[in-house]
C-alpha cells in the first residue's frame, strides 16, 4: 500500500459502524499480507488513534486476524488508555469541585467535553492530550489561583501578559495525569466575532454524570472542531487533517445535521471542504454531508501531495511557515510599532527577556522537528 492508500484504509477502519462489510476486506488484506502493519501502527500512533482502532477491530472480531504481536500491542494500548481516562474523569471531578466551592462552573471543551458528554462508546476510545475548560473572564485568574492553591503549577515559566492570553499557561499537578488549560477565550481573537464565550454559554449543556460543570452544545462542538483543525492549526493551509478530529466530527454528525451547522460558520468554503474531506476519508455516503466545492479539491490535492512526497511536505510547509513568521509576524509588528506605543512596549519587553529567546527557539524547533 502507498501512504495515501494506507491513510484511506485507516479512515474506513474508523467508520466500520457505517459499513461493517469492510471488515471482510480487512480480513482479506490480512491474509494477503498486503498491509505493512509497522507503517499502519506508525500512522495510527501519529494520529493518536491506536486505542480507537483496537476498539473497532475488537467490536467486529478482527483482532484474531491480525499478527499476534500487533493484536497484543493494540490491546495493551487500549487498556492503558482506558485506565488513563478513568484517572482523567477523577481529575475532572476534582477540578469541578474545587471551582464550585468558589462559585465557578467550568465549561469543558474538546476531548474532555466529549468524554463527559458520552460521545464515545467506551471511555478508552479517545486519547486525551489536555483538559481544556472555559470560564467567564471575571473568573479567569481566580480559577488559576484556585488550582494553584490545590498544588497545580505552570509546566514552564511564561514571559507574556497572562491576563490577555487566550488561555492561562499550561498547568500540571504531580498527583494527576493530565495537563490543564484554563481558557479565557474559546478560540483566537481572529474568530471571536462569530464564535465566542457568549454564544457557547447560550447553548451550553449540563453534564449528567457530573454536576456543577457544562459542555458546549453539539452544534458548537462541531464549530470548535472545525476552527481547531482547519483554522487555528492551519490544516486547510497545509493540507493536513487529524484522524482524531475527523472521528469526533463523525460521531457528532450522528447527533446533529452538519448542513445546518455550516450556517453558523463564517469560513463557509473551508468548512464545506473539511466536511467533504471527512466524508471521503471515512468512506461515507452523502448522508454524512452531500456537498463538495473547489476548496475541497484544493485540500485533497495538498493532502495527496503531502503523502506522495516527503520533500513536498517539508518544503511546502516550511515555505508557508517562514513566510507567515516574517511577513505576518516580524514585519507586521515592526510596522505597527511605528504608530502603536503598546506594540513598541511589547517588543521591547520581549527583547529584554532572555526567556523569550528560549521560547522562540523552542517554537521553531518543535515545528521543524515534525
Give the positions of each predicted feature.
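Conserved NTP-donor binding/palm subdomain of two-metal-ion nucleotidyltransferases/polymerases, i.e.
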Residues: 1-129, 135-370
Amino acid at each position: 500500500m502507498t501512504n495515501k492508500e494506507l491513510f484511506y484504509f485507516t479512515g474506513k477502519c474508523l467508520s466500520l459502524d457505517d459499513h461493517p462489510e469492510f471488515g471482510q476486506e480487512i480480513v482479506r488484506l490480512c491474509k494477503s499480507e498486503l498491509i505493512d502493519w509497522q507503517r499502519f501502527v506508525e500512522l495510527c500512533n501519529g494520529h493518536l488513534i491506536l486505542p480507537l482502532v483496537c476498539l473497532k477491530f475488537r467490536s467486529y472480531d478482527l483482532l484474531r486476524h491480525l499478527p499476534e504481536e500487533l493484536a497484543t500491542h493494540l490491546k495493551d494500548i487500549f487498556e492503558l488508555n482506558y485506565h488513563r481516562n478513568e484517572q482523567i474523569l477523577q481529575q475532572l471531578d476534582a477540578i469541578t469541585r474545587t471551582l464550585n466551592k468558589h462559585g465557578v462552573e467550568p465549561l469543558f471543551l474538546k476531548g474532555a467535553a466529549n468524554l463527559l458528554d458520552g460521545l464515545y462508546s467506551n471511555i478508552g476510545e479517545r486519547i486525551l492530550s489536555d483538559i481544556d475548560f472555559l470560564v467567564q473572564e471575571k473568573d479567569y485568574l481566580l480559577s488559576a489561583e484556585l488550582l494553584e492553591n490545590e498544588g497545580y503549577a505552570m509546566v514552564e515559566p511564561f514571559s507574556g501578559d497572562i491576563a490577555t492570553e487566550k488561555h492561562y499557561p499550561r498547568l500540571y499537578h504531580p498527583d494527576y495525569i493530565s495537563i490543564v488549560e484554563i481558557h479565557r477565550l474559546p478560540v483566537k481573537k481572529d474568530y471571536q466575532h462569530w464564535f465566542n464565550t457568549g454564544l457557547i454559554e447560550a447553548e451550553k449543556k449540563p453534564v449528567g454524570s457530573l454536576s456543577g460543570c457544562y459542555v458546549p452544545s453539539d452544534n458548537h462542538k462541531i464549530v470548535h472542531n472545525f476552527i481547531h483543525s482547519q483554522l487555528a492549526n492551519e490544516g486547510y493551509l497545509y493540507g493536513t487533517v487529524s484522524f482524531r478530529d475527523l472521528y469526533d466530527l463523525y460521531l457528532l454528525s450522528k447527533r446533529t445535521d452538519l448542513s445546518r451547522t455550516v450556517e453558523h460558520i463564517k469560513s463557509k468554503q473551508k468548512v464545506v471542504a473539511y466536511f467533504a474531506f471527512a466524508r471521503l476519508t471515512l468512506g461515507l455516503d452523502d448522508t454524512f454531508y452531500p456537498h463538495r466545492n473547489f476548496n475541497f479539491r484544493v485540500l485533497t490535492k495538498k493532502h495527496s501531495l503531502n503523502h506522495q512526497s516527503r520533500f513536498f511536505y517539508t518544503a511546502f510547509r516550511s515555505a508557508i511557515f517562514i513566510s507567515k513568521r516574517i511577513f505576518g509576524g516580524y514585519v507586521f509588528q515592526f510596522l505597527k510599532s511605528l504608530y502603536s506605543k503598546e506594540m513598541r512596549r511589547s517588543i521591547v519587553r520581549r527583547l529584554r527577556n532572555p526567556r523569550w529567546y528560549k521560547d522562540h527557539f523552542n517554537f521553531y524547533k518543535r515545528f521543524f522537528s515534525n
